[in-house]
Amino acid sequence: MARIKVHELREKSKADLSGQLKEFKAELALLRVAKVTGGAPNKLSKIKVVRKSIAQVLTVISQKQKSALREAYKNKKLLPLDLRPKKTRAIRRRLTKHQASLKTEREKKKEMYFPIRKYAIKV
């Protein structure tokens, strides 16, 4: 079986993809048996192609699942951890802009009673 194009896989339904995955896995099992029994060299070189095809199908399946989850959680308040943006640990623990801008009562009073003086230079 020749290698398949990924754009063709993306157009298929989930049932078609799982069926194709089963076909590839069955073919891989046959090729491995042929390898053990000393099969033709062209079959041995085909193992790599089939393994890559299996990887492609699995990748497309997982990408479809993830995009469906993204759509499901689009307007929700909280997201699952794997759908959140990947940032460094320090950035994730940083205060939010709102939290950083909050001031204590004492700070508010001090700013109210002693505002920053503004000077105009006379020329």
Curated annotation (Swiss-Prot):
**Which superkingdom is the protein from?**
Eukaryota
Query: Cross-referenced InterPro entries, in alphabetical order?
Result: Ribosomal_uL29 (IPR001854), Ribosomal_uL29_CS (IPR018254), Ribosomal_uL29_euk (IPR045059), Ribosomal_uL29_sf (IPR036049)
**Keywords from the named record:** Ribonucleoprotein, Ribosomal protein
Q: A GO CC term?
A: cytosolic ribosome
Which Pfam family, any one of them, does this sequence belong to? Ribosomal_L29
Q: Does the keyword Heme apply?
A: no
Q: What are the recorded GO MF terms, alphabetically?
A: mRNA binding; structural constituent of ribosome
Question: What biological process terms from GO does the record include?
Answer: maturation of LSU-rRNA from tricistronic rRNA transcript (SSU-rRNA, 5.8S rRNA, LSU-rRNA); translation
NCBIfam families recorded: L29 (TIGR00012)
Q: Into which family does the record put it?
A: Belongs to the universal ribosomal protein uL29 family.
Provide the protein name. Answer: Large ribosomal subunit protein uL29y
Write down the species.
Arabidopsis thaliana (Mouse-ear cress)
> Organism classification, top ranks?
Eukaryota, Viridiplantae, Streptophyta, Embryophyta, Tracheophyta
